[in-house]
Design a protein with these regions (language model features):
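Residue-level recognition of single "structural anchor" positions
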Residues: 1-134
Length: 134
């Protein structure tokens, strides 16, 4: 599970777990930085979670959750273990946690550098990629 920030566009929380229970989600929310609002999809487990800010529970469309869906697509693209369970799976959850920690650190460094570069050079193409941060 992941929590993302729209501005700056970074992963602010992640948990590797065998379940999606409310208590697991609550731990992730408690350790992440506070936000003014939290947008979730229609998963019922979010109803029991206490969010420090406003909670937008959107069951009808993805307009509030497209950012986290985009990050999850990136995770599935760059980490094969998350792409196809039938072909590739982690032997231990600790291994997946370690891989995810490295990815999140590199992804967030890339995102902050990309934002800085765009503020200095508006409209220019970025001369570096995510792989430069591993």
């Amino acid at each position: 599970m992941t929590m993302v920030s729209r501005k700056p566009r970074q992963i602010v929380g992640h948990v590797v777990s065998r379940d999606k229970m409310s208590s697991t989600i609550q731990q992730m929310v408690d350790t992440a930085p506070e936000a003014k609002q939290y947008c979730t999809d229609g998963y019922y487990g979010y109803l029991d979670v206490v969010f420090p800010g406003k909670h937008i529970f959107n069951v009808h469309n993805k307009k509030d959750t497209f950012t986290v869906e985009s990050f999850n697509a990136d995770l599935r693209h760059y980490i094969p273990t998350l792409a196809r369970r039938s072909r590739c799976f982690p032997r231990k959850l600790d291994n997946l946690r370690a891989v995810l920690n490295v990815f999140v650190k590199a992804f967030n460094s890339f995102a902050s550098q990309k934002e800085l570069y765009r503020s200095i050079h508006p409209g220019a193409t970025i001369p570096f990629s995510l792989f430069d941060f591993f």
